[in-house]
Design a protein with these regions (language model features):
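Long, contiguous bundles of hydrophobic transmembrane helices that form the permeation core
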Residues: 163-240
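Alpha-helical transmembrane segments and, especially, the helix-loop junctions at the ends
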Residues: 85-95, 112-146, 166-171, 298-311, ...
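Juxtamembrane and boundary regions of transmembrane helices in multi-pass small-molecule transporters
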Residues: 110, 149-192, 214, 337-396
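Interfacial loop-to-helix junctions that mark the boundaries of transmembrane helices
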Residues: 1, 24-35, 148-158, 190-193, ...
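Membrane-interface alpha-helices at helix entry/exit sites of multi-pass transporters
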Residues: 68-76, 106-119, 146-157, 321-333, ...
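Membrane-embedded alpha-helical segments and adjacent helix-loop junctions characteristic
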Residues: 26-113, 252, 256-322
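Hydrophobic alpha-helical transmembrane segments in multi-pass integral membrane proteins
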Residues: 135, 205-212, 258-277, 382-388
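Hydrophobic mid-bilayer segments of alpha-helices in multi-pass membrane transport proteins
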Residues: 1-20, 32-44, 197-205, 215-234, ...
Length: 396
C-alpha cells in the first residue's frame, strides 16, 4: 500500500511550509488516539481470525447450503460478507473472505467475479449497520458522539435497504453467470482454536456494543480484546508469529496519521466552519437536506477516498457540536455506501483490487464501474430514500 507515503509526504510538506506547527500536528494525532487504537486492535483481531479459520468455515458453510445453485450461493456469500463486516469490519471482509472465495470458485470451476463483487460491495453496504463496522464510522463518530440507541434507530432501515438492494442488483447484473450447478465443496480446514476465537470475537462485539451504549472509547475495547486473543492463541502454542505479523495492515497507521495532520492543517486554514455551515444548512432543510447531505458525502468520498473525507466531516462536526444524529448518519450513508462506485473510494475497495490482481484477475477502473454501478446506485438510492423516510417520520 503506497498511499501511506503520499499521506506522510503531504503531512511533511505542510509542516515544512509552516501551515501547521509540529506541536499542533502532534496534538492532532494524540486527540485521535481512540481511532488509532481501534484500528490497531482491529487488525490484530482480523489476523487472529484469519489464522483460526473462522471465515473458511463460514465460506464452506455457504457452499454446503447453496443447494447446488449458483444464485443461492451468491446470496449466501453476501450474507457471510455482511456478517464478517458487522463483526470484524469491511476491511476484514475483503482481506479474509475475498481470497477464500476466489480459491473456492476456481476449485469448483464457477465464475469468480459474481462472488468477488459480492465480497466488496457487501463490505461497503453492511458497514453502516454498526458504528464499528467501518473505520470511517469510528473517525466520524469520534468527533460527534451518537449514542448507540439513537444510531440504530436511524441507521437500521437504511442499512437493511442497502443490503437488500445490493443483493438484488448483484443477482440481476450477474444473472447470466449464475446459471448452472455447483460441484461438491471442499472440506473446511481444521483449527483447534476456531471455537475459542469465535467466542472471543463474540465477546468483543458485546463489549463494543456496551462501550457504544455508555460512550466509552471503542479503541480500548479493540486493543484489550486483541491482547486477550493473542495471549490465548500463544498459550496454546498455535500462534504463527510470521503469518500473524504479515496479516496486519501496518501501512494504514502512517497513512491515517498523515491524513490527520493534513486535515488539521486545513482546519487551521478555516475548513471546519465551512463544513459546519454546510451541515447546518442540511439540517435546516429537513428530510430533503438529509438526503442531499448523504449524496454530497458520497460524491466527496469518491473524489478523495472516504477516509480523508471522514476526517473532513469530523472537523465540520467538531465545529458544529449541535449536529443531530440524523445529520451524522446521513454523512455515514454517503461515506460508507458512496465508495462502491469507484476503485479508489474506500480502503476496502483498494485492498480488494490488489487481492484480485495478485491472483491474476486484472480489473480496470472502467470494468469495475460498469459492473458495480448498478449495485452501488441501488444501495445508495435505497439507503437515502430510507433515511429520508426515517428523518421525515422523526420530524413529526
Amino acid at each position: 500500500m503506497r498511499e501511506w507515503a503520499v499521506a506522510v509526504g503531504g503531512a511533511a510538506a505542510v509542516l515544512a511550509i509552516g501551515a501547521i506547527t509540529p506541536t499542533a500536528a502532534l496534538a492532532s494525532l494524540v486527540r485521535e488516539w481512540d481511532v488509532f487504537a481501534f484500528l490497531l486492535g482491529l487488525f490484530v483481531i482480523v489476523a487472529i481470525a484469519e489464522q483460526s479459520g473462522i471465515v473458511d468455515r463460514l465460506t464452506v458453510f455457504a457452499w454446503c447450503h447453496a443447494g447446488g445453485r449458483r444464485d443461492r450461493l451468491l446470496v449466501l456469500v453476501s450474507a457471510v460478507a455482511a456478517l464478517v463486516t458487522v463483526t470484524l469490519s469491511n476491511d476484514a471482509t475483503v482481506l479474509i473472505l475475498t481470497p477464500l472465495v476466489i480459491a473456492l470458485c476456481r476449485a469448483l470451476a464457477v465464475p469468480v467475479l459474481p462472488y468477488a463483487f459480492a465480497c466488496v460491495l457487501m463490505a461497503n453496504a453492511a458497514s453502516l449497520v454498526l458504528p464499528v463496522a467501518n473505520p470511517a464510522n469510528v473517525i466520524v463518530l469520534h468527533d460527534a458522539p451518537v449514542r448507540l440507541g439513537s444510531y440504530l434507530a436511524i441507521a437500521a432501515l437504511p442499512s437493511a435497504a442497502a443490503i437488500v438492494a445490493t443483493v438484488a442488483a448483484l443477482l440481476f447484473v450477474f444473472r447470466a453467470d449464475l446459471r448452472g450447478g455447483l460441484a461438491d465443496p471442499p472440506a473446511a480446514p481444521g483449527d483447534p482454536d476456531t471455537t475459542i476465537v469465535a467466542v472471543g470475537i463474540g465477546a468483543i462485539m458485546l463489549a463494543y456494543l456496551a462501550a457504544l451504549a455508555v460512550g466509552w472509547p471503542v479503541g480500548a475495547v479493540a486493543v484489550s480484546g486483541a491482547v486477550l486473543l493473542v495471549a490465548a492463541r500463544t498459550a496454546r502454542g498455535h500462534l504463527d508469529a510470521g503469518r500473524f505479523a504479515r496479516g496486519i495492515e501496518w501501512a494504514v497507521l502512517p497513512f491515517l496519521a498523515g491524513l490527520f495532520v493534513l486535515v488539521s492543517a486545513a482546519e487551521r486554514a478555516g475548513l471546519g466552519p465551512v463544513v459546519a455551515g454546510a451541515l447546518a444548512e442540511a439540517e435546516g432543510a429537513g428530510a430533503l437536506g438529509t438526503a442531499g447531505l448523504a449524496l454530497a458525502a458520497a460524491a466527496g468520498s469518491n473524489a478523495m477516498n472516504n477516509l480523508p473525507f471522514a476526517l473532513v466531516a469530523g472537523e465540520g462536526l467538531r465545529a458544529a457540536p449541535g449536529a443531530g444524529a440524523p445529520t451524522v448518519v446521513a454523512l455515514l450513508v454517503g461515506i460508507d455506501l458512496g465508495p462502491s462506485f469507484t476503485t479508489v473510494g474506500s480502503l476496502a475497495t483498494l485492498i480488494w483490487i490488489l487481492i484480485l490482481r495478485k491472483r491474476g484477475i486484472p480489473l480496470t477502473a472502467l470494468t469495475y464501474l460498469r459492473i458495480a454501478f448498478l449495485p452501488a446506485l441501488a444501495a445508495l438510492a435505497a439507503a437515502v430514500l430510507a433515511l429520508a423516510t426515517v428523518s421525515a417520520l422523526a420530524a413529526h
